[in-house]
UniProtKB/Swiss-Prot annotation:
PROSITE patterns: B3
A GO cellular component entry from the record: nucleus
Entry's Gene Ontology molecular function annotations: DNA binding
Keywords: DNA-binding, Nucleus, Transcription, Transcription regulation
Subcellular location: Nucleus
Region ranges (Disordered): 1-78
Low complexity composition-biased segments: 8-23, 36-46
Protein's recorded name: B3 domain-containing protein Os04g0386900
Classification via Pfam families: B3 (PF02362)
Lineage: superkingdom: Eukaryota
Known DNA-binding region: 93-191
Amino acid sequence: MRAATALPSIPSSSSPSPMASDPTELRCSSPESSGDAGAEDPAAVDAAEESGGEGGSGHIAAGTEAAPPRPPEPEPEKVARHGVLPLLGKPYFTCIMCKSHVQPPFQVVVPRSFAPLLPSRTTPATLSWRGRSWGMRFTGGRLIQRLEAGWRGFAVDNDLRLGDGCVFELLVGGGGEQERVEFRVQVLRAEIPARIRGRAGGYTSATPIVID
């Protein structure tokens, strides 16, 4: 008699496989159930636009335009180097300050070559520099012409020192019987050391200070 052999049972194809996923897990979540943070509520967007207005931060109200950028401010006129202004194209003479200019007798002798442009008699004179004016006396004549009786005030107020240069531009004047003289003056600083300024000489251009 043949013995019966027990065969292992084969699961039926209709039975669910242990590895098979639950069909409910494969379903895509609907927008309503997922709560997607990237979607915006149209009603919320409309409310934000209405509350922004013209005063809202970063928003421009409908019907308005952004203000155009302001043009750059024009640069102020550049000051000439060392405060020296361009000449006006008028007659002028230059003078290096000697001791007689910044110490008694406090006077400026005008070069002879400039004499034809100035009155031949004593007249009032005005010097202007940096918005201020100083009155003094101009002494005219054939042999010598000079600025005095008031020049001291100009020299002291502007702290003129030995070696400084001055440019005198004739604004009002002319030969003959002119009633007054007016100069525009510019000062160029020399910065000569005090130990040199104290040496002998330097009262006129004919007697300069000698530097060893």
